[in-house]
């Protein structure tokens, strides 16, 4: 066997293995970018020796064979995949190939869409009624998922409107919005179920359940993007026209579909979508670019596994492979001990990543991770990089187990794990230097006491030199003592003292947030302050009384109750008040007497506001009788969505909650 034949055999075997893991087992082991690289390498070798191309080569077909647990459906019109481009130069070369094949010097009109990261499906309607649905499978035969698809509310069981073809096969993507993905994993962690690595795996796992009742509980959705069978009817002669017709018949279509009349317009669309990607509320991995004219599509035709008239323009990979060199353990302000993987540095989505959170001991066990393992790292938007999975097929021989500490790595105190919680915590409290540092950094932060000029490095030095043990000690600092710190001159020291003095005048909500009570964020602190009005009333509240506050359940109520029951915490509060920390007396609001559209409503703010700060908006809403919550739930009455609204907006839409924009909020504030 020639060396090139050996290379081809190995590449095909490797690709088939990963196709099986991806399409059949829903458990991909390598990132898409690595699969694409292997496929490109195989194509290049086959281009050198076309006589060695075999009919079963991965370059000659689409995917892997379906599971035998489902009935099979043969696609009358094969479900092909798309070729990919990864940079502007490759796209421009594709554009030129299309123009050359069309023998045209005029710009092609392109229809540009989002490349959804879900599961491709085919849905057949006969006389407007849904009769079957199938996965892509290997492109010619897929799995019968009709019962499961019927549970997806976004997909109509019957089309409405006129001139519906006798047989119409719609193709599109089933996917899981980010909010739904987070909810599924949250429920799984609570019940000990399977935690999914990403929304795509969750969507595939949900759709390919043998029990449709499980699928029905998952918030899957769908966008259509193409057609297969078309009999007994007509469709418009452009791709965009067809999408608009689908929408008119009741099929969901993405609202991010754009016609582009030049290559530059396509590149602009690509860049704009990439910029908006973190705020879409669902995962995409690029854009799809199609010749808009159906006549030109027919003229261009197909290659073995993909159309010549379309291409997927993929974003820089959000997943890459690297090695775990070590695992260190960090201690947070609540004592939570978090394992952090130290990685062989790797570029992920344009950022050099050398660390990734491992969350807790359960996550390490779920991954089966060992030090020295080859892993897939994912970084999506601003999310902290995380380990998606271990590449077990490439595990080195010299790996070693990760041993969770039995004592705090900072102060040496015992660690504990409360039954029902995934987190291991240091029991040292404020005797632990790490907890003390993080608690003080939180206390002085902008959204808490807002002490200008007191950064993390100053806090680190104050704790390390034993100048400060509790938040109250901060207000006893003098300019003279601060001047002794590194890179702190007399003027800077006096500025910090002045900032501390200014910070004494605060609000009840900010003060509560600054205390760092577990699970009490800004919105919960504001809710507690508004409901109880005074510190004395809050300290005297029972767990049952605390649960009457919007968005406060048994877990948060217990943390708040336990915090105020702890004598050392009460002592710190007394000291803070003695040092002059104060806030305005509460203004009692009778919601029944307020003539406002917000009175008595539970409101959630999401996204960025341009006309006022978020704090100002909250204050004005509360003054008009609203309860401002931090998360969307069935109890939410209204969501105000600013620019770049993300998962909260998606969840509101999923729950059918009324959504208004900033302009409407301002109009109602003045009503």
Curated annotation (Swiss-Prot):
InterPro entries: BRCT_dom (IPR001357), BRCT_dom_sf (IPR036420), DisA/LigA_HHH (IPR041663), DNA_ligase (IPR001679), DNA_ligase_AS (IPR018239), DNA_ligase_CS (IPR033136), DNAligase_adenylation (IPR013839), DNAligase_N (IPR013840)
Keyword NAD carried by entry: yes
Residues at which Zn(2+) binds: 408, 411, 426, 432
Record: residues binding NAD(+): 32-36, 81-82, 113, 136, 173, 290, 314
Keywords: DNA damage, DNA repair, DNA replication, Ligase, Magnesium, Manganese, Metal-binding, NAD, Zinc
Domain BRCT: 593-671
Pfam families recorded: BRCT, DNA_ligase_aden, DNA_ligase_OB, DNA_ligase_ZBD, HHH_2, HHH_5, Nlig-Ia
Catalysed transformations (reactions): NAD(+) + (deoxyribonucleotide)n-3'-hydroxyl + 5'-phospho-(deoxyribonucleotide)m = (deoxyribonucleotide)n+m + AMP + beta-nicotinamide D-nucleotide
Domain of life, source organism: Bacteria
The keyword Zinc appears for this protein: yes
A GO CC term attached to the entry: cytosol
A single GO BP: DNA replication
Active site: 115 (n6-amp-lysine intermediate)
An annotated Gene Ontology molecular function: metal ion binding
Entries under CDD domains matching the protein: BRCT_DNA_ligase_like (cd17748), LIGANc (cd00114)
EC number(s) stated in the UniProt entry for this protein: 6.5.1.2
Cofactor or coenzyme needed: Mg(2+); Mn(2+)
UniProt function note: DNA ligase that catalyzes the formation of phosphodiester linkages between 5'-phosphoryl and 3'-hydroxyl groups in double-stranded DNA using NAD as a coenzyme and as the energy source for the reaction. It is essential for DNA replication and repair of damaged DNA.
Family: Belongs to the NAD-dependent DNA ligase family. LigA subfamily.
Protein name, as recorded: DNA ligase
Lineage of source species: Bacteria, Pseudomonadati, Pseudomonadota, Gammaproteobacteria, Enterobacterales
């Amino acid at each position: 066997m020639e060396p090139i034949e050996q290379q081809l055999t190995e590449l095909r075997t490797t690709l088939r293995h990963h196709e099986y893991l991806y399409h059949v087992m829903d458990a991909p082991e390598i990132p898409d970018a690595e699969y694409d690289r292997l496929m490109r390498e195989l194509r290049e070798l086959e281009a050198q020796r076309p006589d060695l191309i075999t009919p079963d080569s991965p370059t000659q077909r689409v995917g892997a064979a379906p599971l035998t647990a489902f009935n099979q459906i043969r696609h009358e019109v094969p479900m092909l995949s798309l070729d990919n481009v990864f940079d502007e130069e490759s796209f421009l070369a594709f554009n030129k190939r299309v123009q050359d094949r069309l023998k045209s010097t005029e710009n092609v009109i392109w229809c540009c869409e989002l490349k959804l990261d879900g599961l491709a499906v085919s849905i057949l309607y006969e006389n407007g009624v849904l009769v079957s649905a199938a996965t892509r499978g290997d492109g010619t035969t897929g799995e019968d998922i009709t019962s499961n698809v019927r549970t997806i509310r976004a997909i109509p069981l019957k089309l409405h409107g006129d001139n519906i073809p006798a047989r119409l096969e719609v193709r599109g993507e089933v996917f899981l919005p980010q909010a739904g993905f987070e909810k599924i994993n949250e429920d799984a962690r609570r019940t000990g179920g399977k935690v999914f690595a990403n929304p795509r795996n969750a969507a595939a796992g949900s759709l390919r359940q043998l029990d449709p009742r499980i699928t029905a509980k998952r918030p899957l959705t769908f966008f259509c993007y193409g057609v297969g069978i078309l009999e007994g009817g007509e469709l418009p002669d452009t791709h965009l026209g067809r999408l608009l017709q689908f929408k008119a018949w009741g099929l969901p279509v993405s609202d991010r579909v754009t016609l582009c009349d030049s290559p530059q317009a396509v590149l602009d669309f690509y860049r704009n979508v990439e910029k908006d990607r973190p705020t879409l509320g669902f995962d995409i991995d690029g854009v799809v670019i199609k010749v808009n004219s159906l006549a030109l599509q027919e003229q261009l035709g197909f290659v073995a596994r993909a159309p010549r008239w379309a291409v997927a323009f993929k974003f820089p990979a959000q997943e890459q492979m690297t090695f775990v060199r070590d695992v260190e353990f960090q201690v947070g302000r609540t004592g939570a001990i978090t394992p952090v993987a130290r990685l062989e540095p790797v570029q992920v989505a344009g950022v050099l990543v050398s660390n990734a959170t491992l969350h807790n001991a359960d996550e390490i066990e779920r991954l089966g991770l060992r030090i020295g393992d080859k892993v897939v790292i994912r970084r999506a938007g601003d999310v902290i990089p995380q380990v998606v999975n271990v590449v077990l097929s490439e595990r080195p021989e010299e790996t070693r187990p990760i041993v969770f500490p039995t004592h705090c790595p900072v102060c040496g105190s015992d660690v504990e794990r409360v039954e029902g919680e995934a987190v291991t915590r240091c029991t040292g409290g404020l005797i632990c230097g790490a907890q003390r540092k993080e608690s003080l950094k939180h206390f002085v932060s902008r959204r808490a006491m807002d002490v200008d000029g007191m950064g993390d490095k100053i806090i680190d030095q104050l704790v390390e030199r034993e100048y400060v043990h509790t938040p109250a000690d901060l207000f006893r600092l003098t300019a003279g003592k601060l001047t002794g710190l590194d890179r702190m001159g007399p003027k800077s020291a006096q500025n910090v003292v002045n900032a501390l003095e200014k910070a004494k005048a605060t609000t009840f909500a900010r003060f509560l947030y600054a205390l760092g009570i577990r699970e009490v964020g800004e919105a919960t602190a504001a809710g507690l302050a508004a409901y109880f009005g005074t510190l004395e009333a809050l300290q005297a509240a029972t767990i049952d009384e605390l649960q009457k506050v919007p968005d406060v359940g048994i877990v948060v109520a217990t943390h708040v109750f336990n915090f105020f029951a702890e004598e050392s915490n009460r002592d710190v509060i007394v000291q803070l008040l003695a040092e002059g920390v104060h806030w305005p007396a509460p203004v009692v609001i009778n919601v029944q007497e307020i003539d406002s559209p917000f009175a008595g409503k539970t409101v959630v703010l999401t996204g960025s506001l341009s006309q006022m700060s978020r704090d100002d908006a909250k204050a004005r809403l509360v003054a008009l009788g609203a309860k401002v919550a931090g998360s969307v739930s069935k109890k939410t009455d209204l969501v105000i969505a600013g620019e770049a609204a993300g998962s909260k907006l998606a969840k509101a839409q999923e729950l059918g909650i009324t959504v208004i924009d900033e302009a409407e909020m301002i109009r109602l504030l003045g009503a």
